[in-house]
């Protein structure tokens, strides 16, 4: 996934960077770095396991600890 695809996925899931980070078992800083422009020195390419999890979440999988917000399931 590209940095723009990761950000689009996070937004489609209705998650803040810290919430997606919790679901991926990483720090929020890591999510922000994966979403940053590849030309930035702090940009990070997501690990394969993270991409698989994001795709599973986009397909509708929700673990028991999925963030809950008012008006969102």
Predicted regions and their residues:
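The DNA-contacting recognition helix of HTH DNA-binding domains
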Residues: 17-18, 28
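Short, charged recognition helix plus adjacent turn
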Residues: 39-40, 56-73
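A short, Lys/Arg-rich alpha-helix, primarily the initiator
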Residues: 1-12
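Short, basic-rich loop-to-helix N-cap that marks the start of a DNA-contacting helix
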Residues: 38-55
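Recognition helix of helix-turn-helix/homeodomain-like DNA-binding domains
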Residues: 25-43
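Conserved hydrophobic/aromatic packing and binding residues within compact polymer-binding modules
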Residues: 6, 20-21, 31-34
């Amino acid at each position: 996934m590209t940095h723009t695809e990761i950000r689009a996925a996070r937004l489609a899931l209705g998650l803040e960077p810290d919430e997606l980070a919790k679901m991926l078992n990483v720090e929020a800083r890591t999510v922000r770095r994966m979403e940053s422009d590849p030309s930035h020195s702090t940009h990070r390419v997501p690990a394969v396991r993270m991409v698989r999890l994001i795709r599973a979440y986009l397909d509708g999988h929700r673990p028991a600890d999925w963030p809950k917000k008012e008006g969102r399931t």
